[in-house]
Curated annotation (Swiss-Prot):
Residues annotated as binding ATP: 641
EC number: 6.1.1.4
GO MF annotation: an example: ATP binding
Similarity-based family: Belongs to the class-I aminoacyl-tRNA synthetase family.
UniProt name for this protein: Leucine--tRNA ligase
Catalytic activity: tRNA(Leu) + L-leucine + ATP = L-leucyl-tRNA(Leu) + AMP + diphosphate
Locus of motif 'HIGH' region: 46-56
InterPro entries linked to this entry: aa-tRNA-synth_I_CS, aa-tRNA-synth_Ia, Leu-tRNA-ligase, Leu_tRNA-synth_edit, M/V/L/I-tRNA-synth_anticd-bd, Methionyl/Leucyl_tRNA_Synth, Rossmann-like_a/b/a_fold, tRNAsynth_Ia_anticodon-bd
């Protein structure tokens, strides 16, 4: 029985007691049970940064609510937890704190595990792992060597950000205004050998698979479709001439708009293209530009925002139809890693080419017009002013200035050109994808070692499986200049597995997306000798995956791809890793600041600010508690370290209790929307928890309740019982189908309020109240499990795991009403209400509605033309 003092809600004591019971009974450990339907629910695993933030709390509470609800509805539920433990932040922390990344990471895991446990999540901790341990990453090393042998992993040069001072590769986020974040050195673009996985071999399957993911948000599927970027077009060959007219290797370009081919006035190539390097040998000015472009961005997003720059190479390309020679230009918006590194430039019908041509005075030719212009602007074409219709393929177009192709529409031109080029061997139809192969090499220390050995005689050799894992040394001194494994000859130097000669290990490590691409499957069989075992096919695919929409493309794309690799390796049977995806919104909070001496802003944590609000709760002013002086109000933004507007979950748990924090995080907004943190709202949830606690103890203190006898209930007792079962029905739907936890909580609060007004101390009155209180405790259990655990005992039901108690079912007979209240409208305007028997006839309802005193007053002098009855809701009298 609960030892908590009646009428005093002590969250810490309640929560400690419940958690001790769950731990002692291993309440949430599961195995494969064919007698129950399985439900595999998880959140995206956290990076062990050192402390939970409110985004974590919201994410994991959503998963926990669904998991606990599913247990109560008879499912065999797996909810695991682990740690995405490799990555750049550990290296940065190691530099700052002068400690090894491993030591920092493992200490953070210990701390964050304790934080998670304090929130009472129903996690099977027996399946916990950290992705930085050899027991975990040995399996992805083994998989990689198998992919190498199948040709799905390969090595080629790729462009990276290079810091010449620190002698290291930088992630895009480590480049600030073109300089290294730590050294301040001007960052260069450098080509280095890197390993790739052929995700492009799966592009069409990844695209088609989205049509089967009915449980994924449309927004995520749209982002993935756009990222895969399937397009149908022609690959066309342009012969190339050197400055002296000598032939060079031809260019092949891909275009989805072959109808604009006669508008090509130049060809653009990437700065790293072999033809650009060839031309630069005899052109110092061009060579200088190529050197400058080394310092530019390496991503499509960066290139889109950069000022467009370029230079003529002196080379020319031969137009494949007209035979005219057009100049070849280097352009900084062409990526060597995208397509062929060359594009045919049609400035008349491509905005990027249009801007470039206008900047450098290149010809611009119109070769397409609208067949049915909508206005005068669409009838005119201006080579100095861009209009969107110039490139609108969705409109009906007609070719002009295109020789024998004049008058054709897009489809006709596509077919005519495709037939011509295929017949002459100058081109072919092609399906192209925006998706690029996945570069998995990272020039960092704190990651999974890539299991490859380099031999002067044998080349790149996969590490034999009996020599795996290649273990990353953890006890290192990390300065941030270079990688400890690069500078450690005892680790780096080895022998070739094929010839036995001297060789060296690969010193790059895997992209950390590798670890997070298969961990969901590993939870199903965490002690398996291979990557997974037969248990994976019991649990996979996961039934619900909860995480932020910011992971819609990279993580979730690689996640789907890697699962298909595992399927093709016969490790899993399913095509997709997750059936349903829930993308929760951000946690946001108010921001406050003072102007800094350097012109910036000093951001102040909301906990250090006293806020003034108007009667509607809006912030009208704020002062710093320390000095009483005003601070600026910066608006509401995502909680972040940079804006210093985060709220420490541990401080909230210490102040209010885990259940109250969980309750607020589920009540403040629907899961998919942003949640604004508001401590006044947390106070409100704390008051509700105390009120519920008192309601239960007050009821129990008045003595035991007799058995409920529905045959003798009064009208008021029936009304409360009906409210109870209406609430059960709504909350069941909100939990199970809609994931609308805020409305579920609101419904329970309404029932609590109705019960507070129910002043009936009779035996059956108390029986009705007992049923309602038991229902409330069970309905709230997925969200407030500690308090529910205690209150269930107070209600005389004993100490048990509530997840094994069946979720309440609405009694259909309790929902039947003896009488109904209907709104009475006159010509659509509310004029009164009437109470009618549930089985009243239409004639009786019409008579009562017209006799309602206020309605009768408005009907004076009017004739009733029609009476519309919406059953159970409205009577609308149409009169004139």
């Amino acid at each position: 029985m609960s030892t908590v003092e009646p009428n005093v809600y002590d969250p810490q004591q309640v929560e400690t007691s419940a958690q001790q019971f769950w731990d002692a009974t291993r309440a949430f450990q599961v195995d494969e049970n064919s007698e129950k339907p399985k439900f595999y629910c998880l959140s995206m695993l956290p990076y062990p940064s050192g402390a939970l933030h409110m985004g974590h709390v919201r994410n994991y509470t959503i998963s926990d609510v669904v998991s606990r609800y599913k247990r109560m509805t008879g499912h065999n539920v797996l909810q695991p937890m682990g740690w995405d433990a490799f990555g750049l932040p550990a290296e940065n922390a190691a530099i700052k704190n002068k400690t090894a990344p491993a030591k920092w990471t493992y200490a953070n895991i210990e701390h964050m595990r304790a934080q998670l446990k304090s929130l009472g999540y129903a996690i099977d901790w027996s399946r916990e792992f950290a992705t930085c341990t050899p027991d975990y990453y040995v399996h992805e090393q083994r998989m990689f060597t198998r992919l190498m042998r199948k040709g799905l992993a390969y090595r080629r040069n790729a462009v990276v950000n290079w810091d010449p001072i620190d002698q290291t590769v930088l992630a895009n986020e480590q480049v600030i205004d073109g300089r290294g974040w730590r050294s301040g050195a001007l960052v260069e673009k450098r080509e280095i050998p890197q390993w790739f996985l052929r995700i492009t071999d799966y592009a069409q399957e990844l695209l088609d698979g989205l049509d089967q993911l009915d449980g994924w948000p449309d927004s995520v599927k749209t982002m993935q479709r756009n990222w895969i970027g399937r397009s149908e077009g022609l690959e066309i060959q342009f012969d190339v001439r050197d400055i002296d007219g000598a032939p060079l290797d031809p260019l092949r370009v891909f275009t989805t708009r072959p109808d604009t081919l006669m508008g090509v006035t130049f060809v653009s190539i990437a700065a790293e293209h072999p033809l650009a390097l060839h031309a630069a040998k005899s052109n110092p000015e061009l060579a200088a530009l190529l050197e400058t472009l080394k310092h530019g961005g390496v991503s499509e997003a960066e290139l889109e925002t950069q000022e467009k720059r370029g230079m003529a190479t002196g080379l020319t390309a031969v137009h494949p139809i007209s035979g005219e020679q057009v100049p070849v230009w280097v352009a900084n918006f062409v990526l060597m890693g995208y397509g062929t590194g060359a594009v045919m430039a049609v400035p008349g019908h491509d905005q990027r080419d249009f801007e470039f041509a206008n900047k450098y005075g290149l010809p611009i030719v119109q070769v397409v017009k609208l067949r049915e212009p909508r206005n005068e602007e669409e009838q005119t074409w201006d080579a100095t002013h861009w209009r969107d219709w110039y490139t609108d393929k969705s409109r009906e177009l007609e070719l002009i200035n295109s020789a024998e192709f004049d008058g054709l529409d897009f489809g006709g031109a596509f077919e005519a050109l495709a037939e011509r080029f295929e017949r002459k061997g100058q081109g072919q139809r092609r399906v192209n994808y925006r998706l690029r192969d996945w570069g998995v090499s990272r020039q960092r220390y704190w990651g999974c070692p890539i299991p490859v050995i380099y031999c002067a005689k044998c080349g790149a050799v996969p590490v034999p499986e009996d020599q795996l894992p290649v273990v990353l040394p953890e006890n290192v001194e990390f300065s941030g200049t270079g990688s400890p494994i690069k500078t450690d000859p005892t680790w780096r130097q080895t022998t070739c597995p094929d010839c036995g000669g001297p060789a060296e290990r690969e010193t790059d490590t895997f992209d950390t997306f590798m670890e997070s691409s298969w961990y969901v499957a590993r939870y199903t069989s965490p002690n398996a000798r291979d990557m997974v075992d037969r248990r994976a096919n019991y649990w996979m695919p996961a039934d619900l995956y909860v995480g932020g929409i910011e992971h819609a493309i990279l993580h979730l794309m690689y996640f789907r791809f890697y699962h298909k690799l595992m399927r093709d390796a016969r490790l899993v049977d399913s095509d997709e890793p997750v059936t349903n995806l829930l993308t929760q919104g951000m946690v946001i909070a108010e921001t406050f600041y003072r102007d800094a001496d350097n012109g910036g802003k000093d951001w102040i944590n909301p906990a250090d600010v006293e806020i003034q609000r108007d009667e509607r709760g809006r912030v009208t002013g704020a002062v710093l508690i320390a000095d009483g002086q005003p601070v600026h109000i910066g608006g509401t933004e995502k909680m972040s370290k940079s804006k210093n507007n985060g709220v420490d979950p541990q401080s909230m748990v210490a102040k209010y209790g885990a259940d109250t924090v969980r309750l607020f995080s589920m009540f403040a907004a629907p899961p998919e929307q942003s949640l604004e943190w508001n401590e006044a709202g947390v106070d409100g949830m704390a008051r509700f928890m105390r009120r519920l606690w008192v309601q239960v103890h007050k009821h129990v203190g008045e003595g035991a309740a007799v058995a409920l006898d529905v045959a003798v209930l009064s009208a008021e007792q029936k009304a409360i019982r009906r409210k109870t079962h209406e609430t059960i029905g709504k909350v069941s739907d909100d939990y199970g189908r809609r994931h609308s936890f805020n409305t579920a909580i609101a419904a329970v609060m309404e029932l609590s309020n109705a019960l507070a007004k129910f002043d009936d101390a009779s035996e059956q009155g108390r029986a009705v109240r007992q049923e309602a209180l038991e229902a409330m405790v069970l309905l709230l259990n997925p969200i407030t499990p500690h308090a529910s655990h205690a209150l269930w005992q107070v209600l005389g039901r004993g100490e048990t795991l509530l997840e094994n108690v069946a979720f309440p079912q609405a009694d259909a007979s309790a929902l039947v009403r003896d009488a109904l209240t209907l709104a009475v409208q006159i010509n659509g305007k509310l004029r009164g209400t009437i109470d009618v028997a549930a089985d009243a006839t239409r004639e009786q309802i019409e008579a009562l509605a017209q006799a309602e005193p206020n309605a009768a007053k408005f009907l004076e002098g009017l004739s009733v033309r029609k009476i519309i009855i919406v059953p159970g809701k409205i009577v609308n009298i149409v009169a004139g």
